[in-house]
């Protein structure tokens, strides 16, 4: 008989508007930044122009007051947020469009991996800061998308290795 246990997950993020947040990745971008920075979140100018200050304020209030904001620790919502911050997709016309576009934009020749805390690899605040920093510096979205993907994979490899040793496991599964 096989037994499965959830050993790790990254930060839970509010999904402002519930399922609507999966169709409107900009909501997850606001959620991500609000969760990490609070009301003083660093919003890229281009993002504010595309989405609008009123929408951002409304969603921020929803998160602050915990109104219709179920939590998600799914990778898809994180990828939605990053795709929106990079200006790749603010709205999904079909399921997982933003993460797919983020992957398509990634320049596979870029081997950059952002540095991260190997003792706490699932704390992705450093990853978001690195993405925002590169965005502010004018690094092409294709390079940022590649570094984001590579870093996200690397952090999970570190976490899986840690859990395998800690739990004395010979097999681990990503779900």
Task: Label the model's feature ranges.
Residues 25, 29-30:
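N-terminally biased helix-coil "hinge/interface" segments that flank
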Residues 170-175:
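Glycine-rich phosphate-binding loops at beta-strand->alpha-helix junctions
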Residues 5-21, 43-45, 62-67:
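Short beta-alpha connecting loops at secondary-structure transitions
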Residues 1-2:
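Gly/Thr-rich phosphate-binding beta-strand-loop-beta motif of the actin/hexokinase/Hsp70
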Residues 31-169:
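A contiguous, well-structured pocket-lining segment that forms one wall/lid of small-molecule binding clefts
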């Amino acid at each position: 008989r096989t037994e499965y246990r959830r050993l790790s997950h990254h930060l839970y993020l509010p999904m402002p508007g519930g399922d609507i947040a999966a169709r409107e990745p900009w909501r997850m971008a606001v959620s991500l930044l609000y969760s990490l920075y609070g009301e003083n979140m660093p919003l890229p100018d281009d993002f504010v122009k595309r989405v609008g200050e009123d929408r951002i304020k409304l969603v921020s209030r929803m998160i602050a007051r915990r109104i219709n904001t179920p939590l998600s620790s799914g990778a898809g919502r994180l990828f939605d947020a990053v795709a929106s911050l990079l200006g790749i997709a603010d709205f999904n016309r079909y399921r997982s469009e933003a993460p797919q576009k983020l992957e398509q934009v990634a320049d596979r020749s870029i081997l950059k991996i952002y540095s991260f805390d190997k003792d706490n690899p699932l704390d992705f605040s450093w990853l978001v800061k690195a993405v925002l920093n590169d965005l502010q510096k004018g690094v092409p979205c294709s390079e940022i998308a590649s570094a984001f993907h590579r870093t996200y994979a690397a952090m999970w490899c570190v976490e899986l290795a840690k859990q395998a040793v800690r739990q004395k496991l010979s097999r681990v599964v990503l779900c």
